[in-house]
Regions:
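Sec-dependent signal peptide recognition
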Residues: 2-8
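C-terminal motif of bacterial Sec signal peptides marking the signal peptidase cleavage site
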Residues: 13-16
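Tryptophan-centered motif/residue detector
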Residues: 45, 70, 109-110, 172, ...
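Gly/Pro-enriched, hydrophobic low-complexity segments
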Residues: 139-220
Length: 220
């Protein structure tokens, strides 16, 4: 009987210790990249089966555009233009499709850069600091992301991303090949909500009548 009680006590102590060890496990810390992605509705991306958008660049009287339909779950892309329609799967890219796909990657990046902070596992993300933003001249948080020198269509590029205290992106600086001088500086403005996903439709420079913008955006 004493042996039974002894074994029972040991068993209870083991269960108690196990429960305490399980409850003491720290929660995974959310990275800055994840916080920015979440602020733009990243948790809703898993429900997306198709996204349509037109990428535009307007400067004074000149206009450039290209339209896309992307089915992320199937990894399918449809490039739409006045001349023709190109339908391809991103898992099979040959030399003929490289130019089309590089255009898609560029345009998608502008549209969904907050999510790229999670999707692009090879990037390096700096610690966030607060400093004066280049266009608004207001105090914003800033991180710098850099890409490896090999792989992708534009290896080695860097971006200085400025975001507010709600983790919404407000401006950015693109630095080609991680050079010191900026290649492009634009705003992120005119945010619209598409089924829980927040997208900045307009990106403007500090001077001049230049606007990289998105139209015909549909997310299903």
């Amino acid at each position: 009987m004493k042996n039974f009680i002894y074994i029972a006590v040991i068993g209870l102590l083991f269960i108690s210790c196990k429960q305490k060890s399980e409850t003491k496990q720290p929660e995974k810390e959310i990275s800055i990249g994840e916080k920015i992605a979440n602020a733009h509705g990243f948790e809703n991306w898993k429900q997306v089966s198709e996204i349509q958008f037109t990428f535009n660049v307007d400067e004074d009287s000149s206009h450039f555009e290209r339209s896309w339909i992307w089915k992320p779950k199937a990894n399918e892309v449809i490039a739409l233009s006045k001349k023709d329609t190109i339908n391809y799967n991103r898992s099979v890219i040959d030399s003929i499709l490289t130019k089309t796909d590089s255009g898609f990657i560029n345009d998608k990046y502008w549209l969904l850069v907050p999510f790229q902070l999670v999707w692009d596992e090879s990037i390096t993300i700096s610690e966030g600091i607060k400093e004066e933003a280049p266009i608004s001249k207001t105090q914003l948080n800033r991180i710098t992301i850099t890409y490896p020198n090999e792989g992708g269509y534009t290896p080695g590029d860097a971006y200085d991303i400025y975001y507010d205290d709600d983790f919404l992106i407000k401006q950015w600086i693109f630095r080609k090949a991680n050079q010191k001088e900026p290649s492009v500086i634009t705003t992120f403005e005119n945010y619209q909500d598409f089924n829980g996903i927040k997208i900045a439709l307009d990106h403007k420079k500090a001077k001049g009548n230049w606007n990289l913008n998105f139209t015909n955006v549909k997310i299903n």
